[in-house]
Amino acid sequence: MAPPNKFRINAKNYFLTYPHCSLTKEEALSQIKTLETPVNKLFIRICRELHEDGSPHLHVLIQFEGKFQCKNQRFFDLTSPHRSAHFHPNIQGAKSSTDVKSYMEKDGDVLDHGVFQIDGRSARGGCQSANDAYAEAINSGSKASALNILREKAPKDFVLQFHNLNSNLDRIFTPPIVEYISPFSSSSFDQVPEELDEWAVDNVVSAAARPLRPVSIVIEGDSRTGKTMWARSLGPHNYLCGHLDLSPKVYSNDAWFNVIDDVDPHYLKHFKEFMGAQRDWQSNTKYGKPVQIKGGIPTIFLCNPGPNSSYKEYLEEEKNSALRNWAVKNAIFVSLNGPLYSGSYQGATPNRQEDNQTTTG
């Protein structure tokens, strides 16, 4: 007569179920962590659920560093710290740790220890298809959550297509651009030259009232004359300072105008696109796929005097004569002789314009 089958499970991932177990997740985790095994435990997830009669039970997922052979069906027994009671689990090898992990998440009452190990089988096994993984990623609500889901459930795509995934998820989960609220109302600037006021009235307007080809403006003046604060008080805008970042994270195609502040004209990419208020152009100033710019809005260029700042001096260079002839047809140039505000406004309490829905870059 053949001897009875001996208990033995040889697996890297174990799925345990403790029926009618009154232990808390923390009590169970503490005991499981102390179990001595020849291979390290890398990840433990404990889930607490209630039966229909209200009695609790626990599910446990354990991921080992390598295969662990268990020959003792009492090895994973837990004890109550409060009374004389033992809790014996149903023990299974988990073919797809990701499917088990997802199953345990359905009620949300889980406790994790360690770092979850990606299981290649999870992308092909069970009912988890690639479409399911991507649908879950899109519905996750954030780029970080979506990437984590794809890392677990579509590891091949995560490794081979990470660049595309990263770029596409940036577009899908583009956060709203932080609104800029000007600390000063435009009326706070009581020394604005008439030509600046006239330019703003004609060109800084909503899309419905905007000229087909608005005119840009270059404002040159010393530091602390109020150039930047005045420009940013005019309405919804894109603010680009020091360098250009036209990614959807910071650049809005719904802005009324651009402000380019303290960018050396020698290194300004898309000079004509900005100054000429050109429409429907592409930029790849940052690494990655080109960004489509709607355009058609004027730009305020702010600069200080000097060879590395002044747009006038840049355009007066002999090699830029053709560009100068083009620029004077597409922008006006204003040099400030003093601040845009009188002394009485210096140090005054700023007047906030709560309706000035501007964007920042």
From Swiss-Prot:
Locus of motif RCR-3: 103-106
Self-association and partners: Homooligomer. Interacts with the replication enhancer protein (REn). Interacts with host retinoblastoma-related protein 1 (RBR1), and may thereby induce the transcription of host replicative enzymes even if the cell is not dividing anymore. Interacts with host PCNA. Interacts with host SCE1 protein.
Residues where ATP binds: G221, D222, S223, R224, T225, G226, K227, T228
Name under which the protein is recorded: Replication-associated protein
Location of the active site: Y103 (for dna cleavage activity)
PROSITE patterns: CRESS_DNA_REP
Binding site for a divalent metal cation: E49, H57, H59, D107
Chain positions covered by the region annotation Oligomerization: 156-176
Positions of the CRESS-DNA virus Rep endonuclease domain: 8-116
Family of the protein in this entry: Belongs to the geminiviridae Rep protein family.
Compartment annotation: Host nucleus
Pfam families recorded: Gemini_AL1, Gemini_AL1_M
Gene Ontology CC entries for this record: host cell nucleus
Role: Essential for the replication of viral ssDNA. The closed circular ssDNA genome is first converted to a superhelical dsDNA. Rep binds a specific region at the genome origin of replication. It introduces an endonucleolytic nick within the conserved sequence 5'-TAATATTAC-3' in the intergenic region of the genome present in all geminiviruses, thereby initiating the rolling circle replication (RCR). Following cleavage, binds covalently to the 5'-phosphate of DNA as a tyrosyl ester. The cleavage gives rise to a free 3'-OH that serves as a primer for the cellular DNA polymerase.
Motif (RCR-1): 15-18
Keyword check for Metal-binding: yes
GO annotation, biological process: DNA replication
Free-text comment on this protein's domains from its UniProt entry: There are 3 rolling circle replication (RCR) motifs. RCR-2 is probably involved in metal coordination. RCR-3 is required for phosphodiester bond cleavage for initiation of RCR.
EC number: 2.7.7.-, 3.1.21.-
Gene3D superfamilies xref list: 3.40.1310.20
Coarse class of the protein's main subcellular location: host cell
An example molecular function term from Gene Ontology annotations: DNA binding
Record's cofactor remark: Divalent metal cations, possibly Mg(2+) or Mn(2+).
